[in-house]
Amino acid sequence: MQEELKELKEKALVDISEASSLDKLKDVQVKYLGKKGELTKILRGMGNLSPEERPVVGKLANEIRDDLEQAFEERENNLKEAEMQKRWEEEKIDVTLPGRVISRGAKHPLKKVLDEVHDIFLGMGYNIEEGPEIETDYYNFEALNIPKGHPAREMQDSLYITEEILLRTHTSPVQIRTMEQVAPEIPVRIICTGKVYRKDDDATHSPMFHQIEGLVVGERITLGDLKGTLLNFAKQMFGPEVDIRLRPSYFPFTEPSAEVDISCVICEGSGCRVCKGTGWLEILGSGMVHPKVFEMSGYDPDKVTGFAFGMGVERIAMLKYGIQDLRIFFENDKRMVNQFK
């Protein structure tokens, strides 16, 4: 039995030295010193020894157990130190390396245009108002002189949620909500910007786009005031050489109504492919606020007048930056955005 114990010790020491990880070392420890380990199996045969041999074998077994436990502890410490050294090598930071360059972002062209529009109209004394994107049929249509069955409703393919609730098709409802809140106080000078929704999707239309709406209410407000305001806006947005013209049009919520064109920013009015040879580019719709809209908003149309206008932010950005396809704005292509740093 003494020879068996000595052979076990030699074999165990070899296995301990060859254990390449803490998990493997644990397996070796269980194999030799566990409750069902090799050493335990040998010691179970001590009952067959003579009384003279038992103390000798017992002493040898305890010495071997102590030697193996010490060997396990030393190997465990060595493996832990090696593992720590490996982690240190993998995780250490070379402070002499140059830092990672953080790329500089760029403002989206739509955001640039919105900010510029805000600055222009804030400089003219306007306030900025906001309203809900999910709107009632009343505010989106009826309060704007577009009752149920009105032909003008067919001009806009609306996205309804229920029979009376829809995604707003324009930002004009904000004008109604604002007038209801402040009526009959004057003057009112506001612009409202935000997302609007229609069933359109092609190179010049999107199911979601951004609109800017303007409203002025006061005494003796005239069409001349409207033209002067829009001319001032156009010159600040597109350049001092730009001119505008008003063409008769129709909108249910204004009377009279006018489409507004600017002289072509590409050919400066001489005629080109972009303006189709006319020298003019359409940018917005406008007009004098309809008396029925005043009545439904709490104002007396015999005492006040006003004008309103609306334009698409994407349309302004396309003209300002020479972008041909509106869908580019929504493709999240950093190459396009980075051009506007």
UniProtKB/Swiss-Prot annotation:
Oligomer and partners: Tetramer of two alpha and two beta subunits.
Cellular component terms per the entry's GO annotation: cytoplasm
PROSITE patterns in UniProt: AA_TRNA_LIGASE_II (PS50862)
UniProt EC number: 6.1.1.20
Cofactor annotation remark: Binds 2 magnesium ions per tetramer.
Cystine pairs: none
Family note: Belongs to the class-II aminoacyl-tRNA synthetase family. Phe-tRNA synthetase alpha subunit type 1 subfamily.
Coiled-coil annotated spans: none
The entry's keywords: Aminoacyl-tRNA synthetase, ATP-binding, Cytoplasm, Ligase, Magnesium, Metal-binding, Nucleotide-binding, Protein biosynthesis
Annotated binding of Mg(2+), by residue: E255
InterPro entries, per database record: aa-tRNA-synth_II, aa-tRNA-synth_II/BPL/LPL, Phe-tRNA-synth_IIc_asu, Phe-tRNA_ligase_II_N, Phe_tRNA_ligase_alpha1_bac, Phenylalanyl-tRNA_Synthase, tRNA-bd_arm
Name of the protein this chain belongs to: Phenylalanine--tRNA ligase alpha subunit
Ligase recorded as keyword: yes
Superkingdom of source: Bacteria
A GO term, aspect molecular function: ATP binding
Cofactor(s) for this UniProt protein: Mg(2+)
Enzyme class: ligase
Biological source species: Natranaerobius thermophilus (strain ATCC BAA-1301 / DSM 18059 / JW/NM-WN-LF)
One GO BP: phenylalanyl-tRNA aminoacylation
Magnesium recorded as keyword: yes
Localization in the cell: Cytoplasm
Catalytic activities: tRNA(Phe) + L-phenylalanine + ATP = L-phenylalanyl-tRNA(Phe) + AMP + diphosphate + H(+)
